[in-house]
């Protein structure tokens, strides 16, 4: 841990407060984040938690050491949506083969897309199909403890039975009673349920559907419910390797540090995960800190296919930001667009709703262009340590205050503190060494452009604008355009201040 590292504080959805982060074991910091269901291309809303928790992963590695942090992000490859996509896309193949084609191709695309967004690979990415044994064992334990029951070849969890026991209460994360949750939720009404709020841990597979040997003495093949998958995978990757699990009766060993995901997962998914894990493992908390990122809109509207504003990560990467022109192979172009998308996302605090706009994406690309131009001009190399990233680290240690971190990067750029800029960008996942060191990147071929002189003229123009001397402001703009430098004016959405960016044209 760096000697000068500030105290990391994170907002905990469970307590509704910002808390000092104290890992269970500083040598084994553990985080689990709900990953994709691999049946279709991931959309930009899916990108947000990937980016947010990648920044946290980087920060934890910076504070505690890379070898002391384990980050698990699951892959859901058992789901009714996968079955439906397989039947639609591969009707002539055996069903299991069709499912494998859907999950393998979709997962490969997801991995390529999130890598282009500048994300590190998680330490482990467990797949649901690889952890059926753990799911069955947890379900058997829940039945034995009287909080789950068998009905018509289903196994169901009973929240009311959980709340009749001593220990954690169902509804603590969502801060709602059973009656309130029932009134506000869409629940499956089924004759085999004892109570409407009971949820499925295991269900029978229909003919032709994928199936596995069932728990709880059920003779037919079946498959797991969504919620038990994450309980089992987090146990397998974050508890059992560190002495916890079903064979452990030490509650502290059966908890990990951080669980993350989108705000839409608070109920029912995360509430149900907590119920399953706490009852099976005998602990008060599945994870000590629960973190959730806010919703995403597109150009001020909810993203939906019916509105025609449904944007995948791949759409963003294919957008063709102007800096690269027609140059570059697809991988390089993806990486540049991915960095711009990452910076655009991080300009909004992770807990706040975000409005995705094409203008913000373009402005982010312009800003990165200027930052990388300075790094190249000053011969910045890939940093081995991040000893000059203290301002960015301090901002991120305040509940991942990415806006304050970006403000620190802008200040470093303004005063030409190359070490602080480059290392701060690295800590946020915004530094791609290729764009710093490659000699053939055309967007940085600006030997005849004096960036500092342009910045001075932009500042002079801003003074004229503030003085309402429009003629002189226009004169500077027109002179720069004649020299091949085009100015673009916009407003900072947070402060309302004018932002002027520039690009070489012609």
Curated annotation (Swiss-Prot):
Binding site for Zn(2+): 34, 230, 269, 273
Cofactor: Zn(2+)
Reactions listed under catalytic activity: tRNA(Cys) + L-cysteine + ATP = L-cysteinyl-tRNA(Cys) + AMP + diphosphate
CC annotations in GO: cytosol
Pfam families the record matches: tRNA-synt_1e
Subunit structure as annotated in this protein's UniProt entry: Monomer.
Record-given protein name: Cysteine--tRNA ligase
Source organism (scientific name): Brucella canis (strain ATCC 23365 / NCTC 10854 / RM-666)
């Amino acid at each position: 841990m760096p000697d000068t590292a500030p105290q990391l504080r994170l907002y905990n959805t469970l307590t509704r407060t910002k808390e000092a982060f104290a890992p269970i074991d500083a040598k084994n910091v553990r985080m689990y984040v709900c990953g994709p269901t691999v049946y279709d291309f991931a959309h930009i809303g899916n990108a947000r938690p990937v980016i947010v928790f990648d920044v946290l992963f980087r920060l934890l590695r910076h504070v505690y050491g890379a070898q002391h942090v384990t980050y698990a992000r699951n892959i859901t490859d058992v789901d009714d949506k996968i079955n439906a996509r397989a039947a639609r896309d591969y009707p002539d193949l055996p069903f299991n083969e069709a499912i494998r084609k859907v999950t393998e191709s979709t997962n490969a695309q997801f991995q390529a897309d999130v890598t282009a967004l500048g994300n590190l690979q998680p330490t482990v990415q467990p797949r649901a199909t690889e952890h059926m044994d753990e799911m069955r064992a947890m379900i058997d334990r829940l039945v034995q403890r009287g909080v789950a029951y068998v009905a018509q070849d289903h196994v169901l969890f009973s929240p009311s039975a959980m709340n009749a026991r001593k220990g954690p209460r169902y509804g603590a994360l969502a801060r709602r009673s059973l009656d309130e949750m029932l009134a506000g939720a869409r629940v499956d009404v089924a004759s085999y349920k004892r109570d409407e709020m009971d949820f499925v841990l295991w269900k029978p597979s229909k003919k032709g559907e994928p199936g596995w040997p069932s728990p709880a003495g059920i003779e037919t093949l079946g498959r797991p419910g969504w919620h038990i998958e994450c309980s089992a995978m987090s146990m397998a990757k974050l508890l059992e390797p560190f002495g916890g699990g079903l064979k452990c009766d030490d509650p502290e060993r059966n908890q990990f540090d951080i669980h993350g995901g989108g705000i839409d997962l608070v109920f029912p998914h995360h509430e149900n995960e907590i119920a399953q894990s706490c009852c099976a493992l005998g602990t008060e908390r599945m994870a000590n800190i629960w973190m959730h990122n806010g919703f995403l809109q597109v150009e001020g509207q909810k993203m939906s296919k019916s509105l025609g504003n449904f944007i995948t990560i791949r759409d963003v990467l294919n957008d063709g930001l102007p800096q690269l022109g027609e140059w570059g192979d697809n991988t390089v172009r993806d990486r540049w667009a991915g960095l711009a998308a990452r910076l655009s996302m991080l300009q909004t605090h992770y807990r706040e709703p975000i409005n995705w706009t094409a203008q913000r994406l373009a402005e982010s690309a312009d800003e990165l262009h200027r930052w990388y131009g300075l790094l190249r001009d000053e011969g910045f190399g890939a940093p081995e340590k991040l000893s000059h990233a203290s301002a960015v680290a301090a901002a991120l240690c305040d509940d991942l205050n990415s806006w304050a971190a970006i403000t620190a990067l802008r200040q470093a750029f303004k005063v030409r503190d190359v070490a602080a800029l480059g290392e701060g960008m690295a800590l946020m996942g915004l530094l791609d060494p290729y764009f710093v060191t490659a000699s053939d990147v055309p967007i940085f071929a600006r030997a005849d452009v004096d960036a500092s002189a342009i910045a001075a003229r932009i500042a002079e123009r801003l003074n004229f604008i503030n003085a309402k001397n429009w003629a002189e402001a226009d004169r500077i703009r027109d002179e720069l355009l004649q020299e091949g430098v085009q100015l673009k004016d916009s407003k900072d959405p947070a402060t309302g201040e004018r932002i002027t960016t520039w690009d070489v044209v012609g």
